[in-house]
Amino acid sequence: MITVYSKPNCPQCTATYRKLKALGLPFNSIDVTEDADALAFIRALGYQQAPVVVVREGAQIKEHWSGFRPDLLKKYELKE
C-alpha cells in the first residue's frame, strides 16, 4: 500500500497524485496539517517537506522518500 503524506497547496504533492493515478496505483493520502501523529511520523523518518511517500508491504515499510519522484513511483506500476 502506498501512502502520500501531503499538505495543501503543494505542487509536488499534486504531481505525485497525478502520477499515481496515471500509473493506476491505489494510494491513501494524509494531510499532515490536520494529523499531528502523521506529521510526527514523517519527521521521525527524517523528512521536513511534503510530499512524503511511504510504501508498505503488510505492516512493514518497504521504501520511503520525499518529493515528486516519478522514477520511484514507476517501480510500483501495476502490470496486466
Which residue stretches match the model-derived regions?
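Local sequence-structure signature of Cys/Sec-based thiol-disulfide redox active-site neighborhoods
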Residues: 1-25
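ATP/adenylate-binding site constellation spanning eukaryotic-like Ser/Thr protein kinases
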Residues: 7, 47, 70
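Short polar/charged helix/loop
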Residues: 22, 37-41
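Non-globular targeting/processing and membrane-anchoring segments
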Residues: 9-11, 15-18, 43, 72-80
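Non-catalytic, surface beta->alpha helical segment in thiol-disulfide oxidoreductase systems
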Residues: 56-80
